[in-house]
Amino acid sequence: MSECQFDHVVVIGYGVVTGEVLKTVYSLASKYGYTYEYIEHEVHPFNAAKKLAEAEGIPYNILQDKKDLTRYFEELLMKKTLIISASNNYLFPEKIVSSENIVIINFHNALLPELPGRNAPSWSIYEGKDYTGITWHYVTEGVDEGDIIVQKKCDVTADIRAYELVSKQMRLAGEAFDECYESVLMNHATRKKQVIEKGRKIYKSYEIPGNGCFNLDDSPKEIYKLLRALDYGKNNIFPPARTKKNGIDIQIRRYRSMIMMKDKIAYIFHLIMKIN
């Protein structure tokens, strides 16, 4: 049996990448001799990790209340525990983060130290970045400040929408986790310190690119960028983009780039609008 530094592994989060992480944790448990469990904090109807837990008999808990979740983690303080935070919005309190027995790693959907905080794919698009990526990093008291374990890069293409970029990043995150997980278990993972600029911006969940609004006389390129940054398909991460026409508030329900002229930055849009 390979030498493992942990007695227990906890996976917390939801969605595609969490399911991939849990699958890897489950498949390697007998090799490394740890116990494991899955925690669902934010309940989602199509949760791949929960489905896997139910299908394979993996122990899992639903702890939606933050105080209950914190108490649950406090009960683990006497046990050598690895917590894997994947697509998880719970902020671990200082008592948990600073415990000698607890190690936490987290998936972030940007190339840290860039774009720390929430909804990084949207900000990658809105800020016009040519590329972004994913980061697995150790968790410290500061938001997204811990040492980097592994990163993978992907392009932010001219027509990509937020939900499409997220899909790319989920795939990369699963690949990266498989590459680094065993080294994390054995405490052999390469650690790269982040260079944190003083006063760097941390994006909050309530912040919306462009405040979710545009003017019809804005450049088509800027309008298209905003629309793509807010577009999570059927997931209502942000409210629909808004504009005004003849003094009337309008919501953009659907949009399409119909023409992009060859040597000019020019777009013609087909916008389906709902007048409030």
Please annotate each region the language model reported.
Residues M1-F238, T243, I248-I250, R254-I275:
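One-carbon transfer enzymes
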